[in-house]
Amino acid sequence: MDELLDCLDSELSYFYQIFPKELFQEIAYQTTLYSMQTNPETPFAVKEEDLVSFVACVLYMSIVKLPSTRDYWSSSIGIAHVTNIMPVNGFEKLKSIIHFADNNSADKDDKLFKIRPLINKINEQLNNIPFEENLAYEQIIPFKGRHLIKQYIPKKPHK
């Protein structure tokens, strides 16, 4: 376990431990395939680097909230971290066509078939990452204070 943690020396290497480059290659392939199926005259070729930039923008947008997506690129309140990563038109085009699975090989019984490959790959990667099991259960920590959502549980071992 220590060897793996030592090689994860940066945030980016930890990110790629969960979201490997093969996943981005597969998403780029599926997105390009979908683009060719929907608009064969002018297909939108997606590169792996574009997807990494897209995910970086989405992650940053999930932390810094603005009312509209275009606000991240606006001249008045624009966020430099996002504007330097990719242009707004490229972001919105990629957002409209991103695909994780081929629609032709869809399993109609699976409600999540459109994102199933993404879920499976991330679960597989998370199972490979070692972790320490540090857990503090509520019942181990006695609490005598008051709280609005506190419930009386008569069989709780620590009261």
Regions from the language model: what does each represent?
Residues 1-159:
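N-terminal initiation segments
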